[in-house]
Amino acid sequence: MNNLTLLDMFKHGTATWSAVSSFVVVLFWCVGCWLAFIAIVNYKNAADGKSGIAKPIIQTIIAAIMVAVSRFIPILSATLNNKAAEFSPQSLLSDIPQDGLGLNLAFTSVLLFVQMLGTIAIFRGFLMIWEATNKGAGSGLIGKSWTHIIGGVLAVNIQLTISTVAATFYPGVDLSFLGL
């Protein structure tokens, strides 16, 4: 049996983190379609006088955003970073220069893991906004959901986030090992 090394774990991790990020983006679309169906049912309830019209309208907007999220993440990225780029976790693989030690592979794996967590955070943020449209939702739910969405966008763009923080607090620091 082969001995599993840390480098092997990072190699396998890079493919996994990319696949999970792509899966969550597809999951956004599926859940968005389901939530749109629920919003349509709530329009019927509003027409019958069982609930107000504001709830299904907000739910329709949230569902539409979730269906369009594969195009929405790059728009948020462009807004935050002044740089329009297609959301593609696999693009990180070519940005970081590789060497024989495998250290850069480890950085790539960690950055892809952070991107995956960011994608999940955005997904969770939208579900929290959806939950806030229901009666009895917690008072801090909207703030928490926006924190998840903004933090998720920063995590999806982790290289640019690191670059911005480094330029702000440590001007002149060399970030070439991150592909920046």
Locations of regions flagged by a protein language model:
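Short membrane-interface loop/juxtamembrane segments of multi-pass integral membrane proteins
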Residues: 90-103
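Hydrophobic alpha-helical segments involved in membrane association or supramolecular assembly
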Residues: 3-83, 100-180
